Regions:
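A SIS-like phosphosugar-recognition module
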Residues: 1-232
Length: 232
């Protein structure tokens, strides 16, 4: 048991086993899952959702392992995407709503594992600064689940395309065909919107892994980082 667990009043273990890699990809996904369960339970206890809704959401959660397996089977697409980063000076990850923190996770993993500069931004804030960074050939990863922000995210993506950015598009949307100006597109299995951040995180982590492999970086022990931080 860790020091922080011993000193805490309440602990929610993620039951994901030992995490060897410093980047903690498994721990992050485990934390998302546990937080989903916590929010679901709180909503039920507070009577914000009824028993039918609670049961339906639990049923959706049980579909997650199979959806993850399908996502992993698309690894070859991510290997092709990874080649786009070899000569890049940096990259940008864009998302709206619940996809914004996923963009931050994708950028962090790329920085940690491949030593390539990357930044995550809210797609809606592009015109307040980040758009100035777009130049010809810059890899821009756009995370666009089929939610209420989808059309606005596509509009932001068009702004990037118009300025020469190289789009790597990740979505769970099955309805629309991928824009011909998208360099690479990856569809993850569609699942309930509350669970989609988990599935959308996975390809970003795998992308960082494959970029690191191409650059001959140690994916388990990145330079200058340690599993346990002992100095503030």
């Amino acid at each position: 048991e860790s020091t922080i667990a011993r000193n805490s009043d309440w602990v929610l273990p993620i039951h994901a086993g030992i995490e060897i890699g410093v980047a903690s990809t498994k721990a992050f996904l485990g934390q998302l899952t546990v937080l989903y369960i916590l929010c679901l339970k709180l909503a039920f206890v507070r009577k914000d959702i009824d028993e039918n809704a609670y049961t339906k959401n639990i049923s959706n959660l049980k579909k997650l392992p199979e959806a993850i397996k399908k996502c992993i089977k698309r690894e070859s697409n991510l290997q092709l995407m990874a080649k786009e980063f070899i000569s890049a000076k940096g990259s940008m990850f864009l998302g709206r709503g619940s996809s914004f923190p996923i963009a931050l996770e994708g950028a962090l993993k790329l920085k940690e594992l491949s030593y390539l500069h990357a930044e995550g931004y809210p797609a809606g804030e592009m015109k307040h600064g980040p758009l100035a960074l777009i130049e010809e050939g810059l890899p821009v990863i756009v995370i666009a689940p089929r939610d209420k922000y989808f059309e606005k995210t596509i509009s932001n993506m068009q702004e990037v395309i118009a300025r020469g950015g190289k789009i790597l598009f990740i979505t769970d949307n099955k309805k629309d065909s991928l824009n011909e100006n998208i360099r690479f597109g990856l569809r993850v299995p569609h699942i309930d919107n509350l669970l989609s951040p988990i599935l959308l995180t996975l390809p970003l982590q795998m992308l960082a892994y494959h970029v690191a492999l191409l650059k001959n970086c140690d994916v388990d022990k990145p330079r200058n980082l340690a599993k346990s931080v002992t100095v503030e």
